[in-house]
C-alpha cells in the first residue's frame, strides 16, 4: 500500500483548526447555517449546489445508510443528514475528522440522524460486508493512488443492489498541461487523476453496472470563474478555503480555473450499481 504521509502533510500545511472555530463562534454565535459553512466545508468545484445535485441521485428511504469516502471537513455529510440520510464519513486525515465533528457540534442545523466520522484508509475500509446502501465520492478518488483497491472495497461494503455515486475530477484531453499546485495536490506525483474511460472500466471490472456518466465541465468552469471574481474582491469573507489551505489557495484557485479552461481536467458525475 502507498504511504499517506504526503497527503496528510498537504492538507495539514495550511489548516487553521482552532482559528476556524474561533471565527465561527465570533461571527455566528447562534451557530452557522449550512450555507454559511459552505465556503469552508464545500471545498469541491460547484460548492453546495453540486452537493445538492449529487445527493439527489440517492433516496433516503432506499439508501438510508451512506458512506462518504474522503469526507474532508463534512459539508456533504451535513447536507445529506439534513435530508434524512444516515451518513458515515471516512477520511485519512484525522485533523479533518476532528474539525468535521466540531463543525457539526457548532452547526445551527440539527444533524438528526447523527453523523459518524472515521479515520481510515479507503483501501482497507474498516466496515463489514454489505454495511451500506450507498457510497459517495466527491473530489476524493483523485487523492487515491490505488483506485482499483478502493473500488473493490466499495463493492464489498455495499449491499447487493447498492449504489455508488461520484462527483469527480478526471483527466482532460490536455492533461499534460495540468498546472500545480491544485487543491488536491501540490505536485504531479501526488495527483492520481484517471480518464473517464479508465474510471468507468475500473467500475465495471469491480462488479459495478454503470447507470450514467455526465460531463459537468462547462458548468464547473462557469462556477469557478464566478468564484475567482469573488476571491479578487477586497471584501474579506468570514469563511473561505484559505482557512483550510492557507495563502496557497490563491495560486491553487487560479490554476484550477486555468486547468478547466484549458481542458487539462474535466468534472464528471457518475452513478453505478452493484
Give, region by region, the residue ranges found by the protein language model:
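N-terminal auxiliary segments of SAM/dcSAM-dependent transferases
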Residues: 1-24
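Conserved Class I S-adenosyl-L-methionine
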Residues: 212-274
Amino acid at each position: 500500500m502507498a504511504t499517506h504521509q504526503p497527503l496528510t502533510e498537504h492538507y495539514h500545511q495550511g489548516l487553521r483548526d482552532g482559528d476556524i472555530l474561533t471565527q465561527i463562534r465570533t461571527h455566528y454565535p447562534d451557530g452557522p447555517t449550512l450555507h454559511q459553512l459552505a465556503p469552508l466545508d464545500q471545498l469541491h468545484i460547484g460548492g453546495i449546489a453540486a452537493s445538492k445535485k449529487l445527493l439527489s441521485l440517492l433516496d433516503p428511504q432506499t439508501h438510508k445508510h451512506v458512506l462518504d469516502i474522503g469526507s474532508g471537513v463534512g459539508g456533504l455529510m451535513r447536507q445529506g443528514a439534513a435530508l434524512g440520510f444516515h451518513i458515515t464519513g471516512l477520511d485519512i486525515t484525522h485533523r479533518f475528522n476532528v474539525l468535521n465533528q466540531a463543525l457539526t457540534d457548532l452547526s445551527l442545523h440539527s444533524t438528526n440522524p447523527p453523523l459518524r466520522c472515521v479515520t481510515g484508509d479507503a483501501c482497507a475500509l474498516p466496515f463489514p460486508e454489505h454495511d451500506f446502501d450507498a457510497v459517495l465520492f466527491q473530489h476524493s478518488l483523485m487523492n487515491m493512488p490505488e483506485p482499483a483497491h478502493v473500488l473493490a472495497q466499495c463493492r464489498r461494503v455495499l449491499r447487493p443492489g447498492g449504489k455508488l455515486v461520484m462527483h469527480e475530477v478526471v483527466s482532460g484531453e490536455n492533461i499534460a498541461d495540468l498546472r500545480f499546485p491544485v487543491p488536491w495536490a501540490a505536485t504531479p506525483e501526488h495527483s492520481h487523476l484517471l480518464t473517464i474511460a479508465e474510471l468507468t472500466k475500473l467500475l465495471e471490472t469491480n462488479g459495478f453496472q454503470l447507470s450514467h456518466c455526465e460531463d459537468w465541465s462547462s458548468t464547473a468552469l462557469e462556477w469557478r470563474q464566478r468564484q475567482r471574481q469573488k476571491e479578487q474582491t477586497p471584501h474579506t469573507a468570514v469563511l473561505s478555503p484559505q482557512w483550510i489551505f492557507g495563502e496557497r489557495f490563491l495560486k491553487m484557485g487560479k490554476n484550477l480555473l486555468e486547468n478547466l479552461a484549458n481542458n487539462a481536467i474535466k468534472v464528471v458525475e457518475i452513478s453505478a450499481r452493484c
